[in-house]
Swiss-Prot record:
Record's protein name: Small ribosomal subunit protein bS20
Homology family: Belongs to the bacterial ribosomal protein bS20 family.
Protein's job: Binds directly to 16S ribosomal RNA.
Gene3D superfamilies linked to this entry: Ribosomal protein S20
Entry-linked HAMAP family: Ribosomal_bS20
Gene: rpsT
Source organism (scientific name): Rhodospirillum rubrum (strain ATCC 11170 / ATH 1.1.1 / DSM 467 / LMG 4362 / NCIMB 8255 / S1)
One Pfam family linked to the record: Ribosomal_S20p
Alphabetic keyword roster: Ribonucleoprotein, Ribosomal protein, RNA-binding, rRNA-binding
Gene Ontology molecular function terms on file: small ribosomal subunit rRNA binding; structural constituent of ribosome
GO process terms (BP): translation
Length: 88
């Protein structure tokens, strides 16, 4: 158990930030799953629409520090490639 006031504060702060970060990661996953579901159904227009909504969420994850930039870029790139492959 922490004895210093600042250490106690950090424990509380870390717990609250962890909760927020987990919620943010879950939100990103939800949007990505919606895109993947649209891709699986073969509906290119729905996939594009879902992708346009998911892309800013993924980038926001980078800004907020829950995703690495390369991870976000990789996710976006792979989803985009899968959407393009629907019509081909």
């Amino acid at each position: 158990m922490a004895n210093h006031k600042s250490a106690k504060k950090r424990i509380l702060r870390n717990a609250s930030r962890s909760e927020i970060n987990h919620a943010r990661i879950g939100r990103i996953r939800t949007f990505v799953k919606k895109v993947e579901a649209a891709i699986a159904s073969g509906d290119k227009d729905a996939a594009k629409a879902a992708f346009q909504i998911a892309m800013p969420e993924v980038q926001r994850g980078v800004t907020k520090g829950v995703l690495h930039q390369n991870t976000a870029s990789r996710k976006i790139s792979r989803l985009s490639a899968r959407i393009k492959a629907i019509g081909a």
